[in-house]
Amino acid sequence: MAETDSGKTAEERIPFNYFKKIPKIELHAHINGSISSETIKKLIQRKSTKEKGQNNVVSQWETTILKGDEKNLDECFKMWDFIYPLVDDTEAVFLVTKSVIEDFAQDNVRYLELRSTPRANPKTGMTKESYIEAVLAAIEEAKTTVPDITVR
C-alpha cells in the first residue's frame, strides 16, 4: 500500500466497503467473462459428476486460472479454453447467468447490460436458440431473487 501525506493508506482513508455501497451501472458485461471462482468450482463439480474421468478439469483450472495474480494477455485468453467446455449445456448457461446477475447485485450494481455470443453444442443438445432461452430464463428469475437490479 502506498502511504499518503496523512500517513494512512487509501484503504484506511476510504474503506473498500464504501465503494461497494455506491449504486453502480455496468453497460458491457460478458457473461462468461464475469463468472466468479465460486461458480466455476460449482461448474467443475457438476461436470466431474456428470462425466467421470474429468479430474483433469480441476488440474487445468489450478494451472491456468489460479496460477498467481499476475497474468499476461495470452494467459488471460486461455481462460476461455477452460470455461467454454464447462458452460456447454442450457443448465450451465442458466446457472452461470443467474450467478453473474447475483454477483453484480451483491456489488450494488443497479443496472446491468449482459453480453454473450450464443453457442450451439450438438453433444449436449444445446442450440443457439436454447442458449438464448436459458439466458432469458435466468434474467426473468433474477427479477424475483434480486429485484433491485435491472438486467438487459
Residue ranges and their predicted role:
Residues A2-R152:
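Metal-cofactor-binding active-site regions of metalloenzymes
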